[in-house]
Regions:
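Substrate-binding and catalytic surfaces of secreted/luminal carbohydrate-active proteins
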Residues: 156-164, 168-173, 181, 194-455, ...
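Substrate-binding cleft of extracellular glycoside hydrolase catalytic domains
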Residues: 79-180, 186-196, 285
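Solvent-exposed loop/turn segments at secondary-structure junctions
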Residues: 48-50, 75-79, 96-99, 133-138, ...
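All-alpha RGS (Regulator of G-protein Signaling) helical domain and cognate RGS-like helical scaffolds
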Residues: 467-479
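Terminal membrane/secretory targeting segments in land-plant proteins
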Residues: 1-42, 381-390, 486-487
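Catalytic domains of carbohydrate-active enzymes, especially glycoside hydrolases
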Residues: 56-78, 89
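Hydrophobic faces of well-ordered beta-strands that scaffold small-molecule active sites
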Residues: 41-45, 68-72, 88-94, 127-131, ...
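Short, acidic/polar
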Residues: 46-62, 106-119, 201-205, 409-413
Length: 487
């Protein structure tokens, strides 16, 4: 996508100077950390599921995919023991819930380090300690007042503990989503990006100062999928999948040309850091990827697109790291995720980011080391949902839930759906059109659908604790009519 001709911004020389300075710092730094940069992309190993393989088997699958590192969302001891003796570098995480405690007390931070990190060194190659996950995305008044100001103090206490114990290999940071920027996930042009005013000075300036002083990274969660899916066709799919070819976007502020969406997103973060006086802070991608499936109303979520994105990402990072503003700058990159996680709430895509199904079979082939030529992969299935689905959709009791009915769980979900008012469940009351058959399964399907159809536009999802699923087959029967809405 080529931007229309525009006058050169008077800020362009300053922006180019800052970008050049940032690149100089990155090029000079090279690979200073004790473990160096992993050779293959990393993988996020989430475990919000009840059916995934053991940690030992998971390590085997990570290595089979060519992963060079792994990131977990806690400091789970069995997982860290399974990683011991491997060449995988590891990122662990402090949960959001204890940030305030670690900030208030050095003793608490030191105790956490002693209990959760030290027992696994040096056998497990722990390289990053991330303090919280997307904390700044929670904009509730309570979190903003009590947790945001404590992120950096918690990091400082943990860093002090590591130094006191002679641990110099572990870098401390936190993860931030693209919503830390004023413009959110799609800050175009990148040269105009800036951090949100509610966090720029009180949180991010001290955070960047800490990262710079400890030679650590700004970890960002960057998902081109969501930008593309929400662009209403203004962003080409190939541009989001690294298949842009001649498709380019030129930043009018810097003159830099972009051939893919991820680079735009990363350089926007770099610009925002420069505006706070820290162009030298290095970037890391804490999460990125593409969903391999989703709901009927979720465009482009397919195994084909997921394979193309991750294969191209691995090849790109192996041969041509960096971005237009930071050419050649190597960065840690973690793909989301190792498995499809069946207990993640929200729309269908939330449960379909995995490289592997829960039984350990690959969703698609990928070499995260980027060494396998793209032409050497077997053909992918044809895309089936790269354009929006326009037909009717219903929300019903999921087939797996109906097959092995948990009456208590279904009853709780039914009570929740019917408790929202708006005549949601009138039709399944005695004498109603849908009362028969008088079973929990039949009533649940009606209630789930009625609730979802009424509240879908306000963010409701067809999930109900993994008991519901979308269908395009009309579940109506006899005089019982299920309301529908178009995709």
């Amino acid at each position: 996508m080529v931007a229309p001709p525009m006058a050169v911004s008077p800020l362009r020389p300053l922006l180019l100077f800052l970008l050049a300075a940032a690149f100089a710092c990155h090029a000079a730094d090279g690979s200073r950390s004790a473990y160096g940069h992993a050779r293959g992309l990393g993988v996020n190993y989430g475990r919000v599921a009840d059916d995934i393989p053991s940690p030992h088997r998971s390590v085997q699958l990570l290595r089979a995919a060519g992963a060079g590192s792994v990131k977990i969302y806690d400091a789970n001891a069995p997982v860290l023991r399974a990683l011991s003796g491997t060449r995988l570098t590891v990122s662990i995480m402090v949960p959001n819930e204890i940030i305030v405690d670690l900030a208030a007390s050095y003793a608490a931070a030191d105790k956490w380090v002693a209990a959760n990190l030290l027992p696994h060194l040096p056998g497990t190659r722990i390289k990053y300690l991330l303090v919280g996950n997307e904390v700044l995305s929670d904009t509730s008044a309570a979190t903003a007042a009590t947790v945001w100001p404590r992120i950096v103090p918690a990091m400082e206490n943990l860093h002090r503990s590591l130094r006191a114990r002679g641990v110099s290999r572990v870098k401390i940071s936190t993860t931030l989503a693209m919503d830390a920027l004023v413009t959110g996930a799609f800050p175009r042009p990148p040269s105009a990006a800036a951090f949100r005013p509610d966090i720029a000075e009180p949180v991010l300036r001290p955070l960047l100062r800490f990262l710079n002083g400890t030679n650590s990274y700004y970890f960002v969660d960057a998902y081109p999928y969501f930008v593309w899916a929400g662009s209403n066709g203004t962003v080409p799919l190939d541009y989001a999948l690294f298949n842009g070819g001649a498709t380019r976007y030129v930043d009018p502020g810097t003159g830099l040309a972009y051939t893919n969406l991820l680079d735009e997103m990363l350089d926007a973060v770099g610009t925002a850091m420069s505006k706070l006086g820290h162009p030298e802070v290095r970037l890391a991608i804490a999460e990125t990827g593409w969903p391999n499936a989703g709901d009927y109303d979720q465009i482009g979520a397919s195994a084909r697109n997921a394979a193309v994105y991750n294969r191209n990402l691995a090849a790109r990072m192996a041969r041509n790291p960096g971005t237009p503003a930071r050419p050649g700058a190597r960065m840690p990159v973690f793909v989301f995720s190792l498995y499809n996680e069946d207990l993640k709430p929200g729309p269908g895509t939330e449960r379909h980011w995995g490289l592997y199904y829960p039984n350990g079979t690959a969703v698609y082939q990928v070499d995260l080391a980027g060494r396998r030529p793209l032409s050497a992969y077997p053909p992918l299935p044809a895309p089936g949902n790269d354009t929006p689905y326009k037909g009717p959709i219903w929300c019903v009791l999921a087939a797996h839930a109906a097959k092995k009915l948990n009456e208590t769980a279904v009853g709780d979900a039914l009570t929740y759906a019917c408790g929202q008012g708006n005549d949601t469940c009138d039709a399944i009351q005695p004498g109603g059109e849908c009362f028969q058959p008088n079973t929990g399964a039949a009533h649940a399907s009606y209630a789930f659908n009625s609730y979802w159809q009424q509240l879908r536009k306000t963010g409701a999802t067809c999930y109900f604790n993994n008991l519901a699923e979308q269908t395009i087959k009309d579940p109506s029967y006899g005089s019982c009519k299920f309301q529908s809405s178009l995709g």
